[in-house]
Swiss-Prot record:
Cellular compartments annotated: Cytoplasm
Gene: thrS
EC code(s) of this entry: 6.1.1.3
Binding residues annotated for Zn(2+), in chain numbering: C334, H385, H511
GO molecular function: ATP binding; metal ion binding; threonine-tRNA ligase activity; tRNA binding
GO BP annotations listed: threonyl-tRNA aminoacylation
Cofactor mode of binding and number, as noted: Binds 1 zinc ion per subunit.
Name this protein carries in UniProt: Threonine--tRNA ligase
Assigned protein family: Belongs to the class-II aminoacyl-tRNA synthetase family.
Organism for this UniProt entry: Stenotrophomonas maltophilia (strain R551-3)
Annotated segments matching region Catalytic: 243-534
Residues annotated as transmembrane: none
UniProt entry keywords in alphabetical sequence: Aminoacyl-tRNA synthetase, ATP-binding, Cytoplasm, Ligase, Metal-binding, Nucleotide-binding, Protein biosynthesis, RNA-binding, tRNA-binding, Zinc
Length: 633
């Protein structure tokens, strides 16, 4: 007798081994029809998989997050089915699930075109309409090799070669004549795959190495139903309208070019936006007791060997040689800050010591991973490091947590999720040290009543970290600030203080950043606000425009008065109709446009319009200045 325990605690008894689908059918026909897979003792399995022992079972449907993930994975296999029918000579590589979608890498002699993508999508729809069952067969490794040899699937054979010798059988999933290997699970029938869409085609490389052959990557998305798919498409369209690259060009903020991959050319308006953020964060430094420092961008490789970066991070570093010495462009600011700390003797009474830097760093990101100013090779961080005793860690983490939340809210982010990234496989130090570091972060968050999610394996090589994930205006989540506890780097780089017993000890080092990469943060701000920055943040806060040449001198006077007050203002004295000027500056998303006609000139006033088209009427210049100041501008 086999006992199956369901999530509500009820039990069902079966005389013989049963599949997940059998259990679902015993509960009801409706549930059986909705069943995608099962979770047996916490492990996801196919609906056809047999349970031969007492177990707990949760039926997975499209209402479950796991169910949607399975739909996406099976949609990737469906891409393979359609592609092989249309283009039999291509070779299939891999088709994993990604955030909100999937992709499939394919080797093809010629690049796929948008017309190809439309044809593939059409064929996928036709295959779904056939409402066929997806059949799973657990197949011996040797037989799998013969199957793929017969089909000429060279990349599948390479993937099998990479597998451990312990794997002697694998799941083969059949979509009619098409077959793919996978650990699964997958949907039992194509009727679950109706809410899908292919989104784009890009290039990729075998194993992600640019030295290897190029592949075609077909991206797509899939959801539980058409309503969810339509909501996603609408969200993507909104994201495209907010794309920082588009707005950056429209508003003349920055540009990128081929001669400097992953490096940003900031234009005057973009640099004005940068300066607003930097000066704001500089005030945060001062308010919270950080001394601002400036360290070299290039350091001898010996320092990176001592710090541990050489063993754990060198693939992401840029190197150069001079006078038979090897130097590295810094990928992080922390070793430099330790050098500042090491100049002079410190007592426990001096701690905590806090350093902050707008440090320019460089990381050799793969070219395929670069994306506008959100993913770059050269970036500046609002980086800070705190040198403290173990007893001071909790208070410092608490203070940072509170200041980080205040900053995010000031920039317009109200939904914030906190996560702790735990020890990675490749790391410095022993487990006892990591236990202590992870415990310190948990304790600090717990004492503040903060709920958090844990991310095993995602910490830095030198310590665990708190991560701050912010939700933007259209529901996307961005990881920004971090707070990391590091018990190791101070010892590796010789940082010491004298304790109350006159003994030398290594301080604890806290690595912290609130906005992180300035480039990335500005890209996120552009998309979050859709280029419509609040007045205090906008690169140009006010444009003063004349109606005729008769008001030119008064426009210049108003512009100068505002500029002298510290506002970012420009004058538009072009010989254009005022309607044209209003339309242009509205499209540029300037918060305020001051229109100057004869009446305003005579009365020493300004006619105020907002970028939303609201006419605030005529007011004195002083009244307008007070309005700006009330908005924090």
């Amino acid at each position: 007798m086999i006992n199956i325990t369901l999530p509500d605690g009820s039990r069902r008894e079966f005389e013989n081994p049963v599949s997940v689908m059998d259990v679902a059918q015993s509960i009801g026909a409706g549930l059986a029809k909705a069943t995608i897979a099962g979770s047996v003792d916490g492990v996801l399995v196919d609906a056809s998989d047999v349970i031969d022992h007492d177990a707990s079972l949760r039926i997975i449907t499209a209402k479950d997050e796991e169910g949607v993930e399975i739909i996406r994975h099976s949609s990737a296999h469906l891409v393979g089915h359609a592609v092989k029918q249309l283009y039999p000579d291509v070779k299939m590589v891999i088709g994993p699930v990604i955030a909100e979608g999937f992709y499939y890498d394919i080797y093809s002699e010629r690049p796929f075109t948008p017309e190809d993508m439309a044809a593939i999508e059409k064929r996928m729809g036709e295959l779904i309409a056939q409402d066929y069952d997806v059949i799973k067969k657990v197949t011996p490794r040797a037989e799998v090799i013969e199957i793929f040899k017969a089909r000429g699937e060279d990349y599948k054979l390479r993937l099998i070669e990479d597998m451990s010798d312990d794997i002697q059988a694998m799941g083969m999933y059949y979509h009619q004549e098409y077959v793919d290997m996978c650990r699964g699970p997958h949907v039992p029938n194509t009727r679950f795959l109706k809410a899908f869409k292919l989104t784009r085609i890009s290039g990729a490389y075998w194993r992600g190495d640019a030295q290897n052959e190029q592949l075609q990557r077909i991206y797509g998305t899939a959801w539980a139903d058409k309503k969810q798919l339509e909501a996603y498409i609408k969200r993507i369209e909104e994201a495209e309208m907010r794309d920082h690259r588009r707005i950056g060009k429209q508003q003349d903020l920055f540009h990128l070019q081929e001669e400097a991959p992953g490096l940003v050319f900031w234009h005057p308006k973009g640099w004005a936006l940068w300066q607003v953020v930097e000066q704001y964060m500089r005030k945060v430094y001062r308010k919270t007791g950080y001394g601002e420092v400036r360290c070299p961008q290039i350091l001898d490789v010996s320092l990176w060997q001592k710090s541990g970066h050489w063993d754990n991070y060198q693939d992401a570093m840029f190197f150069t040689e001079s006078e038979k010495r090897t130097y590295a462009l810094k990928p992080m600011n922390c070793p430099g800050h330790v050098q500042v700390f090491n100049q002079g003797l410190h007592s426990y009474r001096d701690l905590p010591i806090r350093y902050g830097e707008f440090g320019a760093c460089h990381r050799n990101e793969p070219s395929g991973a670069l994306h506008g100013i959100l993913r770059v090779r050269g970036f500046t961080q609002d980086d800070g490091h705190v040198f403290c005793t173990e007893n001071q860690v909790e208070a410092e983490v608490t203070a940072f947590h509170q200041q980080a939340l205040a900053v995010y809210q000031h920039f317009g982010f109200d939904e914030i999720q906190v996560k702790i990234a735990l020890r990675p496989e490749s790391r410095l130090g022993d487990d006892a040290t990591w236990d202590k570091a992870e415990g310190a972060l948990r304790s600090a968050l717990s004492s503040n009543g903060v709920e958090w999610q844990e991310l095993p394996g995602e910490g830095a090589f030198y310590g665990p970290k708190i991560e701050y994930h912010l939700k933007d205006a259209i529901g996307r989540t961005w990881q920004l600030g971090t707070m990391q506890v590091d018990f190791m780097m101070p010892g590796r780089l010789g940082a010491e203080y004298v304790d109350e017993n006159s003994q030398k000890k290594h301080p604890v080092m806290l690595h912290r950043a609130i906005v992180g990469s300035m480039e990335r943060f500005l890209g996120i701000l552009i998309e979050h606000h859709a280029g419509q920055f609040p007045a205090w943040l906008a690169p140009t806060q006010v444009v003063v425009a004349n109606i005729t040449d008769a008001q030119a001198e008064y426009v210049s006077d108003v512009t100068k008065t505002l500029a002298d007050q510290g506002f970012r203002v420009s004058a538009d004295l072009r010989n254009e109709k005022i309607g044209y000027k209003i339309r242009e500056h509205t499209l540029q998303r300037v918060p305020y446009l001051l229109v100057i006609g004869d009446r305003e000139k005579e009365n020493g006033a300004v006619a105020v319009r907002t970028r939303s088209g609201e006419d605030l009427g005529s007011m004195s210049l002083q009244a307008f200045i007070e309005r700006l100041q009330a908005e924090g501008a």
